[in-house]
């Protein structure tokens, strides 16, 4: 059997692509080296932020707004919502370049963002402590996503729509010829007109020339109470420290508040180098500088997890066909800020398989930018 699209890597982007391509009427085979959702990539840990006024640059805003519409639609397929509109407050020094980008994105796209000075911040959320020179940019319409629930939902919907799924079966080789794409797996060879490579951190095992660096990252849950929950209108947050370190976190659930540090981490070259949480001495203390200064009421570390970023050199996404192989799309280099975009990236992949021109300007995400 020849498929219209084979998906290599069915985590966040791959799971979304499988659903949207199958829903569009294509014959699709989804593959993964593990059984998604799983602990081997970048989608576990229950929650991920979604922000609209994007500190990483205005070029992302059209993508994230389309993603939000798709998240809202996906949430209708579950009793438990996938998107929780908790609001997100972005904290940092008034001269922060990241916050300047947030404000610029909000102005350009007329997004609902409220600027609060330090006094107003601490009045609205007495649990938060910031220096006098700090501000907060509050996005009331943003929030967080249930990442593993989202992937489970996409996989179920794709399967119900007739999508073939081959999991726990790593792809060892990809071959291109005039008839399309062939993949080799432990279960045999499979053929398709087009392929999506969304293999996450270890994409270089299949495409060694891609400029992607795996980075071991950790996040952890700390003792909290009801003051830090959505019931008390406590928001999700990002926070920039005076030294430039970037943190992110979520409202407490079951008296546990999850937080992680966005920058830093350990460069790794192989899956076995991603040691479990607490294997690196600094893991449990990584969030202390933020918690001690900004959320002093939070208690000790309860547990944590390790994940992996697939960092591109400039930490912008890579969305492009492979050089010399126009029938193979690669989506990688999501650099620790990609999950919120998973549905729109999956939709872009489905449009690629359908032969449609993308609805977005993807020029900033081309591979050619690294050779200029």
Swiss-Prot record:
It catalyses: N(alpha)-methyl-L-tryptophan + O2 + H2O = L-tryptophan + formaldehyde + H2O2. InterPro entries: FAD-dep_OxRdtase, FAD/NAD-bd_sf, Me_Trp_Oxase_MTOX, MTOX. One of its GO terms (cellular component) is cytosol. Its cofactor is FAD. Keywords: FAD, Flavoprotein, Oxidoreductase. It comes from the Bacteria. Gene3D superfamilies: D-Amino Acid Oxidase, subunit A, domain 2 (3.30.9.10), FAD/NAD(P)-binding domain (3.50.50.60). Binds 1 FAD per subunit. One of its GO terms (molecular function) is flavin adenine dinucleotide binding. It is an enzyme of class 1 (oxidoreductase). Monomer. PANTHER family: FAD DEPENDENT OXIDOREDUCTASE DOMAIN-CONTAINING PROTEIN, PEROXISOMAL SARCOSINE OXIDASE. Catalyzes the oxidative demethylation of N-methyl-L-tryptophan. This is N-methyl-L-tryptophan oxidase.
């Amino acid at each position: 059997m020849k498929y219209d699209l084979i998906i290599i890597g069915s985590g966040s982007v791959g799971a979304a692509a499988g659903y949207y391509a199958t829903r569009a009427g294509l014959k699709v085979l989804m593959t993964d080296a593990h059984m998604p959702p799983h602990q081997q990539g970048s989608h576990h840990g229950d929650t991920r932020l979604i922000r609209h006024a994007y500190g990483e640059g205005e070029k992302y805003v059209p993508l994230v707004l389309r993603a939000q519409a798709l998240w809202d639609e996906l949430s209708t397929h579950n009793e438990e919502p996938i998107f929780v509109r908790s609001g997100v407050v972005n904290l940092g020094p008034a001269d922060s370049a990241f916050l300047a980008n947030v404000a610029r994105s909000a102005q350009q796209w007329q997004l609902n963002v409220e600027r609060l000075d330090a006094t107003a911040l601490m009045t609205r959320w007495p649990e938060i402590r910031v220096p006098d020179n700090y501000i907060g940019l509050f996005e009331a319409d943003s929030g967080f996503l249930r990442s593993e629930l989202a992937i489970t939902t996409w996989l179920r919907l794709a399967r119900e729509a007739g999508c073939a799924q081959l999991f726990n079966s790593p792809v060892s080789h990809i071959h291109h010829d005039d008839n399309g794409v062939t993949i080799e797996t432990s279960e045999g060879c499979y053929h398709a007109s087009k392929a999506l490579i969304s293999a996450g951190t270890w994409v270089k095992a299949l495409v060694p020339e891609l400029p992607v660096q795996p980075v071991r990252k950790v996040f952890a849950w700390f003792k909290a109470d009801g003051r830090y929950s959505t019931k008390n209108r406590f928001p999700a947050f990002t926070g920039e420290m005076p030294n430039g370190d970037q943190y992110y976190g979520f409202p407490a659930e079951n008296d546990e508040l999850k937080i992680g540090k966005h920058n830093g981490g350990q460069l790794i070259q192989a899956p076995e180098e991603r040691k479990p949480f607490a294997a690196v001495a600094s893991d449990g203390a990584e969030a202390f500088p933020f918690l001690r200064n900004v959320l002093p009421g939070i208690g000790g570390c309860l547990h944590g997890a390790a994940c992996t970023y697939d960092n591109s050199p400039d930490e912008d996404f890579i969305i492009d066909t492979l050089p010399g192989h126009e029938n193979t799309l690669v989506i990688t280099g999501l650099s620790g800020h990609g999950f919120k975009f998973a549905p729109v990236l999956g939709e872009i992949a489905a449009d690629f398989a359908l032969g449609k021109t993308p609805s977005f300007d993807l020029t900033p995400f081309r591979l050619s930018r690294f050779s200029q």
